[in-house]
Amino acid sequence: MIKHILQVEETKKIFEEIDDNEYEKIQDSRKNDDFIVDDDGYGYRDHGGEIWDRDGDVEEVGKKKKKKQNNHDPNENIMNYMMPASTLKKKSNAASTNPSAQQKPKVSVEQSRDIMNNLFQQLDAKDVDELEDVNEAKNMFVQEMNRPVAFNKEEDFNNRYSVTLESREEQERRRQSEQLKQQANIGQNQSDVNPFSKKRKLDEFQQVQANSYQSKQNSHSVSKSKPGDHEMANHADGVDLNLLAIDDTKMTDSHPSEIITQNQRASAVSSVNQQIMESTNGKNQLEKNDTEWQQMKEKNAVFNQDLRMNDNALMSNQQDYPLPLNEDGTLSFYWIDAHEENNGADLFVFGKIYQHEERKFVSCSIKVNGMQRELFVLPKMSGKSRAAMTTEEEKEQARKVMMELEGVRKRFPAITKWRCKPVTRKYAFELPIQHGEHQFVKIKYDATFPSLPSTVQGNTFECIFGANQSMLESFILKRKIRGPCWMTIRNPQKVTDFRRTWCKQEILVSNPKDIEITLDDLNKTELPPLTSVTFAIKTCRSSQNTNEIAMLSCIVNENISQEGPSKIDVHKSFTLLRKLDGKPMPIEYERAFRDKKDSFIQFFQHERQLIEAFVAKIYQLDPDLMVAHNLCGGMFDLLLARIQMLKISHWSRIGRLKKNQIPNKKSDQSGANYGGSQWIPRQVTCGRLLVDTFLTAKELIRETNYDLTHLAKVQLQKDRIDFDDDLLPTFYVQMAKLFQLIDHTEKDAYLTLQLMNHLQVIPLTKQLTNIAGNLWFRSLQNARAERNEMLLLHEFKKKKFVLPDKKQLNAKDLKKNMFADEYEEGDGKTKGGKRKKAAYAGGLVIEPKAGFYDNIILLLDFNSLYPSIIQEYNLCFTTVNRRPTKNFDGSEMKNQYKKGENGEEEVDIEEADLPDKNVNLKDAVLPMVLRDLVQKRKAVKDKMKTEKDHVKLSQLEIRQKAIKLTANSMYGCLGFGSSRFHAQAIAALITRTGRETLLRTKDIAENKLGFNVVYGDTDSIMINTGSNQLQQALEMGKRLKGEVNCLYKCLEIEIDGVFKSLLLLKKKKYAALKYENFLSPAEVKVVQEMKGLDMVRRDWCPLSKRVGRYVLDQILSGKQREEVVLNLNEFLSNIGNELKEGTIKLNEFIITKQITKAISDYNDIKGQPHVAVAKRLRDQGKSENQLVNNFIPYVICQQTYGDTTKSSTALSDKAYHPDEVISSRGKVTIDSDWYVSTQLLPPITRLIEHIEGIEVEFVAQCLGLDPKKYRYHSEKKNTDNPTDDPLIVSNPVLQTETERSLKNRTVAELNIKCPHCAHNYHFPGILVPSSNNTELTGLACVKCNQRIPDAYMLNRLNLFLKQLTALYYLGMKECKEPQCGMKTNQLLLNNKCIVKGCKGKMNSEYSELRINDTLRYLEGLFNVKKFLIENEKYRKKYEKPELVPNFQSFKELQKKVESFMIRSGYNKVDLGNIFGFMSKGANPHQQKMSIF
């Protein structure tokens, strides 16, 4: 046997053993080795230690680490950090006892001085700008580390641009003063040193170090007395003093001849500490606001442990559980959602069942088979009318129709069979079919066969109804399903193989009749709680200029109530975070994530991993609700785009229906799918409900802004900081900042959940769905028209009506339908583009009497005006006689359009008449539905009065609100063009009746009660009570309420608001102080209300918004007018002085505007300053991807060259980025004149336009402008004082009912100068009351009572009329812009102002309308007959006009005015011009007559 002997070779030593002396030599050699080439010892250096020594320092914690840190000088690290490495090497060599260090050759003092002098001479020979800061890179890094946290651009601008700009003269004066101070402080040793030299800088640097050490000692002594400030002091010494020491180059550049004294350095340190204190206070305030959030996170941290489990462990195998059947073999199923696929061939119902094994509700889906399509065919009439046909003739007609239909079926081989039979149905809609009962042929065939085209025509039938009806809609209507409810499922079959959904349980039903609505459920009586996942995301921009998901935080709540408020305090949360491309993560981020106990954070290297984890979490949690703010406005589209781009597997787990391919159609509402179910977010999430709090807030509350920050503030009383995705990379510098970002994202998700709960979105939309009978997901999408449509479909289906088909939309109509919510009733404009002119007039707007009212104004409003009109006059499709508007193919009838004046088509709607309101027709569906809703709401409100349980009271409040919303929106489906129940004739009739009702109310208020109506809009009026007593004003409102309400049965007006004071500017624009709780005197309080005054637009700078807000607050303050004027004078003067002195910070002038397309696509940038700035930034090296779709900040400036200032007229030449202004060093300064004239004066002018005692001239003078330019506007307002000029512009009270409608037009009043006493007065008319209760003739002077001679009066009137004619033919036009006021009689094109830069319109100063109004006014002054007709008192006294004093004189004066009126072409209506086209010899080129 051979043995193998193993020979082991002697191994080499892995570690080398040396003694202490040799190890110290190695360490010293490391310290002396400059391992950075050409660094000269100023950069990095090796401390000589080992790697494990540094690691131990990092990981060492507890008392041992603290003890080690206290053994050395606390300033040593700072000194070592700031001093060059060469200096540290010298210190180390001098202190070391290493012999090798002492063996180096010594350099004498003289040699050292020579070397240093040579170095300094070389440095002094260079210009200061050529010298580089050796610590520049380190300085930039420290600045980045210590930059204050900014979540949005506004905070970033405030941090960067919260500086005061100095003018060039101020800089020069400051430098001269500093040079004198420097010369006085320069010592003898430094008298020959160049102030720009490095030696000088080194001396200053070392002095700063000494001062910083002294400051360190002082701060330590302070910290002993105030332990709470220790952390702040350490922060100040450890960070900001570094910045002071490092930034020596910048200090020298700004102050070239300054020597930093100890006092100045101490002042600088004090200033820095003050800034730190302010920053710390702000941080403490923010932490105080977030205390509730942090406590909640800590409380819910234990629930997050479930989310840390393995994915497979979290998902148990629920599908193996048996179905929880009832004793009778049925299944109790709670309906939540439904969806159809393959054109209705596959119908899925989603809901929840109670799984006993799990002791909770789990998701379940039902695949419904056996659906049938139903079509109704209308036979064609020939000869006889339907009413005259006999039964046999109807049968023969039906037989012929069925024979032809069989031939039609054979043309479609996919439809193998169907069944037909004649039935009787009703019709009452817009096709040319007589309203009433008719015979139809009903067709039924299996839903797996394709649908029949609705355009099929035949010889024996007119059209086919129901061809494009979706199977889901048919299922809902036939099974009478009205929203989420319990169902009883008979014969359920559990699906185990080839499952089509991701639900925990899946069943199959062979016949839809096996599904029935049940009220008494055998399994569970309460409604199942819903599970919600509320998420918020943070995005970043990729190098390809695409949005990517960087962070995603979710709040999971498994107990969302369907009937009332939910308990959302208890929840789970998790955050998914990934690394940014090209951006390193902070040090030890993984351990920091693991140690974060109050949050569950998962980190991923790539976006793909993050999204896959999110999809997996959705599948595991199986939520019923997916909640986010602005979810449907781009967030979900982004998520799906990234899923498609990254090819995420099992992406359909976001929903509950299994799919292979992501749908690529944006929307397809023209198809048969219910509710436009081809919308992509709906396609991928069917089975789950999408809750977008942005959309629901727009539906449920009225706010000026619907972003999360504003809604959290006004609805939740919570502060939120806006976040700008462009600043996302700045948070990846430190873990503290990254945790702030994570916390911000998690809090966004929680605020969204709070908002959903506060607005009661889930219970309210459920009630709306239960009332209307539509799908819940459509109610969550604010499909108001669809809710009303489904409600009417249920009602008309119940009454055996043939339902109108869904309109087939083309691409153009589809685009309109997507923005259907932007349409207004009776208005022809949309946000998305143009459409035909308004088909009918909308609500009436009474012209406002603009001005400031310092007494109580009452706002009275009709309760649900349009629904009440429908009930009051019994308006319905079946009661209003109207002509048909559509052909059988669904197209509009041609007679619906006529040519307008501009050649465009206008809809010509027949004015329908009101039906007989005393006739009660049983088929009047609209009034019946509204009446039923009103009765239900009344019953709910009566129950609320006696209910004491807060939970039940909240549920009742939600139900009554849902009923109110449904009733108020019922009118909308009539005027909505895409609605199946579109009936413009009925809608026009309702709005016309509404206008008549408002006018009737106005007439009662003014003529019967003598009230002053100052404004009215659609269903409300404002009344000036003339009183400051609240109870007295309310009594006036009650009087009007009683007079109006007694005229109607259903219409009712109520006091809706009481304004203590009102600033009424124009239509839909006012501000007021409003009484709240005015019916309860003990609880009355005054709040400010604004409508239409938009002060948040980005094209107004912060200074403009601040000034406008102050002016408005002063006007509404209730102070005396003199005090308001003094306050405004002081405030505006201070603003003007600050602008002149340049003490306003730069961020107050910043205007932002978005770049919406590629910069090269902008053709003309002269009037677009943001584009000019963006173009300049692009030329400076910024990529276009960083500019497009971003908001560009800019300020308007003027350039300064020496003593001259260059100011261009083009805004593009005057616009600068804030960074450019700062770096210009005084060469570019703010153009204060532009800001005053463009940003400050216009908004102030609009606010004070109707305030007496405050003129534009006064405001311009306060702001430092030339008041002469604005004197015209002041004179234009003060026209009440008579002058020698007989033409005085004013608003006289006209004398006839016809002319009363003209009282808002300016006319020229007749002014008479008495020939006896030379007194000027307005001619008063026929008779005027005197002080002793006697009547005086208008031909007597109001002062001396002397009779005016007839010849003098006639001559004065003749001169007045000639001057009036001369003013008209002068053709003067004036600009309507307040700051322009240009007048000219030049011939203008498009009536645009001729002043360069002004965008105002030029209007005629004396137009034809104004001249005609003046003539009619004058004719009324001398018309005795008209005077007696209008004045009953004088009519009784003077039985005949001839008995009135001076009758002949007035008659002659009237003839003179009538002679001018006859000459006026404007006063005539030439019927020949109007109807001349009907005559054969008509001349189409007749010239228009002149006014005179």
Curated annotation (Swiss-Prot):
Catalytic class of the enzyme: transferase
Binding of Zn(2+) 2, residues: 1375, 1380, 1393, 1398
Keyword Cytoplasm recorded: no
Entry superkingdom: Eukaryota
Entry keyword set: DNA replication, DNA-binding, DNA-directed DNA polymerase, Metal-binding, Nucleotidyltransferase, Nucleus, Transferase, Zinc, Zinc-finger
CDD domains in alphabetical order: DNA_polB_alpha_exo (cd05776), POLBc_alpha (cd05532)
Xref: Gene3D superfamilies: 2.40.50.730, 3.30.70.2820, 6.10.10.100, DNA Polymerase alpha, zinc finger (1.10.3200.20), DNA polymerase family B, C-terminal domain (1.10.132.60), Helix hairpin bin (1.10.287.690), Palm domain of DNA polymerase (3.90.1600.10), Ribonuclease H-like superfamily/Ribonuclease H (3.30.420.10)
One function term, GO molecular function aspect: DNA-directed DNA polymerase activity
Short name of any one Pfam family annotated for the protein: DNA_pol_B
Family: Belongs to the DNA polymerase type-B family.
Function statement: Polymerase alpha in a complex with DNA primase is a replicative polymerase.
Note in the entry: In eukaryotes there are five DNA polymerases: alpha, beta, gamma, delta, and epsilon which are responsible for different reactions of DNA synthesis.
Protein name according to UniProt: DNA polymerase alpha catalytic subunit
Organism of provenance: Sterkiella nova
